[in-house]
Protein backbone atom coordinates (compact mmCIF):
# COMPACT_ATOMS: atom_id res chain seq x y z
CA UNK A 1 0.00 0.00 0.00
CA UNK A 2 1.35 3.41 -0.90
CA UNK A 3 2.30 5.41 2.16
CA UNK A 4 0.88 8.74 1.04
CA UNK A 5 -2.34 8.90 3.06
CA UNK A 6 -3.10 11.71 5.48
CA UNK A 7 -5.56 9.64 7.51
CA UNK A 8 -5.83 5.90 8.13
CA UNK A 9 -9.15 4.62 9.47
CA UNK A 10 -8.96 1.23 11.18
CA UNK A 11 -12.16 -0.76 10.78
CA UNK A 12 -14.74 -0.67 7.99
CA UNK A 13 -17.94 -0.67 10.01
CA UNK A 14 -20.56 2.03 9.53
CA UNK A 15 -18.64 4.50 11.73
CA UNK A 16 -15.32 3.85 10.01
CA UNK A 17 -16.75 4.12 6.51
CA UNK A 18 -18.70 7.26 7.44
CA UNK A 19 -15.74 9.13 8.90
CA UNK A 20 -13.55 8.05 5.97
CA UNK A 21 -16.14 9.38 3.51
CA UNK A 22 -16.51 12.67 5.38
CA UNK A 23 -12.75 13.22 5.52
CA UNK A 24 -12.35 12.35 1.83
CA UNK A 25 -15.23 14.65 0.96
CA UNK A 26 -13.33 17.43 2.69
CA UNK A 27 -10.13 16.88 0.76
CA UNK A 28 -8.16 14.39 2.86
CA UNK A 29 -6.42 11.34 1.40
CA UNK A 30 -7.90 8.45 3.38
CA UNK A 31 -7.25 4.71 3.62
CA UNK A 32 -9.57 2.27 5.39
CA UNK A 33 -7.99 -0.86 6.89
CA UNK A 34 -10.09 -3.97 7.54
CA UNK A 35 -8.72 -7.25 8.91
CA UNK A 36 -11.63 -9.39 7.73
CA UNK A 37 -12.38 -10.61 4.21
CA UNK A 38 -15.69 -8.74 4.13
CA UNK A 39 -16.04 -5.06 4.96
CA UNK A 40 -19.00 -3.45 6.67
CA UNK A 41 -18.83 -4.60 10.30
CA UNK A 42 -22.36 -5.13 11.60
CA UNK A 43 -23.68 -4.14 8.18
CA UNK A 44 -22.52 -7.52 6.87
CA UNK A 45 -24.98 -10.22 5.88
CA UNK A 46 -24.72 -13.92 5.13
CA UNK A 47 -26.79 -16.56 3.35
CA UNK A 48 -28.07 -19.94 4.48
CA UNK A 49 -29.90 -22.11 1.95
CA UNK A 50 -30.53 -19.10 -0.26
CA UNK A 51 -31.93 -16.92 2.54
CA UNK A 52 -30.14 -13.68 3.44
CA UNK A 53 -29.62 -12.80 7.11
CA UNK A 54 -28.33 -9.47 8.42
CA UNK A 55 -25.82 -9.67 11.27
CA UNK A 56 -26.79 -6.40 12.92
CA UNK A 57 -28.83 -3.78 11.08
CA UNK A 58 -32.16 -5.51 10.52
CA UNK A 59 -34.17 -2.33 10.06
CA UNK A 60 -33.62 1.41 10.35
CA UNK A 61 -35.63 4.30 11.72
CA UNK A 62 -36.12 8.05 11.19
CA UNK A 63 -35.29 7.78 7.49
CA UNK A 64 -38.21 9.62 5.94
CA UNK A 65 -37.46 13.03 4.43
CA UNK A 66 -36.63 15.59 7.11
CA UNK A 67 -35.82 12.95 9.72
CA UNK A 68 -32.37 12.47 11.20
CA UNK A 69 -31.14 9.34 9.41
CA UNK A 70 -32.37 10.71 6.09
CA UNK A 71 -30.18 13.77 6.68
CA UNK A 72 -27.15 11.65 7.54
CA UNK A 73 -27.61 9.24 4.63
CA UNK A 74 -28.21 12.12 2.25
CA UNK A 75 -24.93 13.74 3.32
CA UNK A 76 -23.12 10.42 2.93
CA UNK A 77 -24.61 9.93 -0.57
CA UNK A 78 -26.18 6.61 0.42
CA UNK A 79 -29.85 7.19 -0.42
CA UNK A 80 -29.49 6.86 -4.20
CA UNK A 81 -27.79 3.46 -3.84
CA UNK A 82 -30.24 1.68 -1.55
CA UNK A 83 -33.90 0.72 -1.76
CA UNK A 84 -36.13 1.07 1.29
CA UNK A 85 -39.28 -0.83 2.19
CA UNK A 86 -41.57 0.58 4.87
CA UNK A 87 -42.58 -1.65 7.75
CA UNK A 88 -46.23 -1.73 8.84
CA UNK A 89 -46.84 1.75 10.24
CA UNK A 90 -49.51 0.38 12.57
CA UNK A 91 -47.20 -2.35 13.83
CA UNK A 92 -43.50 -1.97 13.03
CA UNK A 93 -42.61 -4.06 16.08
CA UNK A 94 -44.45 -6.48 18.37
CA UNK A 95 -43.82 -6.96 22.08
CA UNK A 96 -44.88 -10.32 23.53
CA UNK A 97 -45.58 -10.18 27.25
CA UNK A 98 -47.47 -12.80 29.27
CA UNK A 99 -49.12 -14.35 26.22
CA UNK A 100 -50.36 -10.96 25.02
CA UNK A 101 -49.09 -9.11 21.94
CA UNK A 102 -48.60 -5.35 21.88
CA UNK A 103 -47.91 -3.31 18.75
CA UNK A 104 -45.50 -0.42 18.40
CA UNK A 105 -46.85 2.02 15.79
CA UNK A 106 -45.11 4.78 13.84
CA UNK A 107 -45.89 8.38 14.67
CA UNK A 108 -46.15 9.75 18.20
CA UNK A 109 -49.93 10.10 18.18
CA UNK A 110 -50.37 6.72 16.51
CA UNK A 111 -48.03 5.10 19.04
CA UNK A 112 -50.13 6.48 21.90
CA UNK A 113 -53.44 5.54 20.28
CA UNK A 114 -52.34 1.97 19.49
CA UNK A 115 -51.04 1.18 22.98
CA UNK A 116 -54.01 2.94 24.57
CA UNK A 117 -56.27 0.28 23.09
CA UNK A 118 -54.49 -2.23 25.32
CA UNK A 119 -54.13 0.13 28.28
CA UNK A 120 -57.26 2.34 28.27
CA UNK A 121 -56.71 3.42 31.88
CA UNK A 122 -53.12 4.49 31.25
CA UNK A 123 -53.50 6.85 28.30
CA UNK A 124 -51.92 9.77 30.14
CA UNK A 125 -48.98 7.59 31.21
CA UNK A 126 -48.31 6.61 27.59
CA UNK A 127 -48.59 10.24 26.48
CA UNK A 128 -46.11 11.27 29.17
CA UNK A 129 -43.66 8.59 28.06
CA UNK A 130 -43.81 9.60 24.38
CA UNK A 131 -43.47 13.28 25.27
CA UNK A 132 -40.47 12.58 27.50
CA UNK A 133 -38.45 10.51 25.03
CA UNK A 134 -39.17 13.01 22.26
CA UNK A 135 -37.97 15.89 24.45
CA UNK A 136 -34.74 14.00 25.17
CA UNK A 137 -34.04 13.54 21.47
CA UNK A 138 -34.92 17.13 20.62
CA UNK A 139 -32.34 18.31 23.16
CA UNK A 140 -29.62 16.04 21.79
CA UNK A 141 -27.43 17.92 19.28
CA UNK A 142 -26.44 14.67 17.57
CA UNK A 143 -30.08 13.83 16.95
CA UNK A 144 -31.68 17.21 16.33
CA UNK A 145 -28.67 19.20 15.01
CA UNK A 146 -29.50 21.80 17.66
CA UNK A 147 -27.70 23.11 20.76
CA UNK A 148 -24.17 22.44 19.48
CA UNK A 149 -23.01 25.58 21.26
CA UNK A 150 -24.09 24.19 24.62
CA UNK A 151 -21.14 23.03 26.72
CA UNK A 152 -23.19 20.51 28.67
CA UNK A 153 -24.87 18.64 25.84
CA UNK A 154 -26.31 15.93 28.08
CA UNK A 155 -28.87 16.49 30.81
CA UNK A 156 -27.38 14.74 33.88
CA UNK A 157 -30.84 13.52 34.89
CA UNK A 158 -31.26 11.70 31.58
CA UNK A 159 -27.88 10.02 31.97
CA UNK A 160 -28.09 9.12 35.66
CA UNK A 161 -31.70 7.90 35.58
CA UNK A 162 -32.15 4.31 34.39
CA UNK A 163 -34.98 3.32 32.07
CA UNK A 164 -36.61 1.28 34.82
CA UNK A 165 -36.40 4.10 37.34
CA UNK A 166 -37.98 6.61 34.98
CA UNK A 167 -40.78 4.42 33.66
CA UNK A 168 -41.64 3.31 37.20
CA UNK A 169 -42.21 6.98 37.98
CA UNK A 170 -44.65 7.62 35.15
CA UNK A 171 -46.76 4.45 35.46
CA UNK A 172 -47.47 1.88 38.15
CA UNK A 173 -48.92 -0.57 35.63
CA UNK A 174 -46.40 -3.43 35.57
CA UNK A 175 -47.52 -4.72 32.17
CA UNK A 176 -47.18 -1.26 30.61
CA UNK A 177 -43.74 -0.85 32.19
CA UNK A 178 -42.60 -4.06 30.52
CA UNK A 179 -44.17 -3.20 27.18
CA UNK A 180 -42.53 0.24 27.07
CA UNK A 181 -39.14 -1.36 27.74
CA UNK A 182 -39.83 -4.33 25.49
CA UNK A 183 -37.39 -3.13 22.81
CA UNK A 184 -34.39 -3.45 25.15
CA UNK A 185 -32.99 -6.53 23.32
CA UNK A 186 -32.71 -4.33 20.23
CA UNK A 187 -29.75 -2.52 21.79
CA UNK A 188 -28.66 -5.00 24.51
CA UNK A 189 -29.92 -2.74 27.27
CA UNK A 190 -30.42 -3.49 30.95
CA UNK A 191 -33.50 -1.93 32.53
CA UNK A 192 -31.78 -1.06 35.81
CA UNK A 193 -28.55 0.20 34.24
CA UNK A 194 -29.13 1.61 30.77
CA UNK A 195 -29.71 5.39 30.95
CA UNK A 196 -33.00 6.93 29.93
CA UNK A 197 -30.99 8.96 27.39
CA UNK A 198 -29.98 5.87 25.39
CA UNK A 199 -33.46 4.35 25.51
CA UNK A 200 -35.07 7.62 24.41
CA UNK A 201 -32.80 8.11 21.40
CA UNK A 202 -33.40 4.59 20.11
CA UNK A 203 -37.13 4.39 20.85
CA UNK A 204 -37.98 7.77 19.33
CA UNK A 205 -35.75 6.93 16.36
CA UNK A 206 -38.04 4.04 15.38
CA UNK A 207 -41.32 5.63 16.42
CA UNK A 208 -40.69 8.33 13.81
CA UNK A 209 -40.49 5.76 11.00
CA UNK A 210 -39.22 2.22 10.40
CA UNK A 211 -37.89 0.69 7.18
CA UNK A 212 -35.88 -2.32 6.08
CA UNK A 213 -33.10 -2.21 3.49
CA UNK A 214 -34.25 -4.16 0.43
CA UNK A 215 -31.74 -6.91 -0.31
CA UNK A 216 -29.67 -6.64 2.85
CA UNK A 217 -27.97 -4.12 5.10
CA UNK A 218 -24.59 -4.66 3.43
CA UNK A 219 -25.93 -2.60 0.52
CA UNK A 220 -25.18 0.41 2.74
CA UNK A 221 -21.52 -0.56 2.97
CA UNK A 222 -21.36 -1.26 -0.76
CA UNK A 223 -22.81 2.17 -1.56
Question: Predicted regions: what is each one?
Answer:
Residues 65, 163, 217-221:
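Hydrophobic (often cysteine-bearing) scaffold residues that line and stabilize catalytic clefts
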Residues 2-131:
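N-terminal glycine-rich phosphate/pyrophosphate-binding loop and immediately adjacent elements
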Residues 200-223:
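Helical element adjacent to the flavin cofactor pocket in flavoenzyme catalytic cores
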Residues 98-195:
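Rossmann-like flavin
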Residues 26, 169-170, 223:
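Generic, well-ordered alpha-helical scaffold segments in large soluble proteins
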Residues 69, 194-198:
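A short mid-domain helix/strand-loop element embedded in enzyme catalytic domains
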Residues 15, 159, 216, 220:
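Short, glycine/acidic-rich beta->alpha junctions
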